[in-house]
Amino acid sequence: AASRAFARGLFHVQGLASQFAALCVGAQPGQKVADLCAAPGGKSLTLAECMQNQGKLISGEYVESRVPLLRKAFARCGVTCAEAVQNDAAQLRSDWGKFDRILCDVPCSGLGVIAKKPDIRYKDLDGIENLLLSQQKILQNGADLLAENGRLVYSTCTVNRDENEEQVKTFLENNPRFHVAVPALQLPGMQQGEYGTLFLPHKTATDGFFAAILETESTQ
């Protein structure tokens, strides 16, 4: 962060697995894109870069005090196509209209980033049911906001199957018009399964991470 190049917005720092999720969105110039759980903003910056700063990017964040982090990141990198807003992704915002591409990088247990945040290992999962419900709501809201022929990416920084594959499986059962698409980007060690792509730290040398590309049958 002390680098002049960083201060000028010439680059931003992001984990490989996190960048993978943002790239899977496939955002393009001129599209309308949403990052529903955006702070601190790394994935939104990658989305804006893919869009070549053209189109409209809505970056929502539930915690109001974190919204300025998004605005600061956009200002530093010269991003003008994005709008940072305080928003509860678990509540549907029909007034936003439809989006061509949506990223749902949902709140999770964080078990994939224990190496960075060792305190996570001391937390129990007593509240996991509420977390799972919130993830389901965010994913469904993303689907409801998606335009015809759109693409939705569901991602977490955990390796907990209940938060990953099982969430996607349940979503597909409730939304049969969707299917899981195989990512064009292939990285060493990542595991492509029926319900998404899993990154395990000992195999990918990244954070533990999960991402699923969800498209409708008519998506080109």
Q: What does each model-identified segment do?
A:
Residues 1-220:
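S-adenosylmethionine
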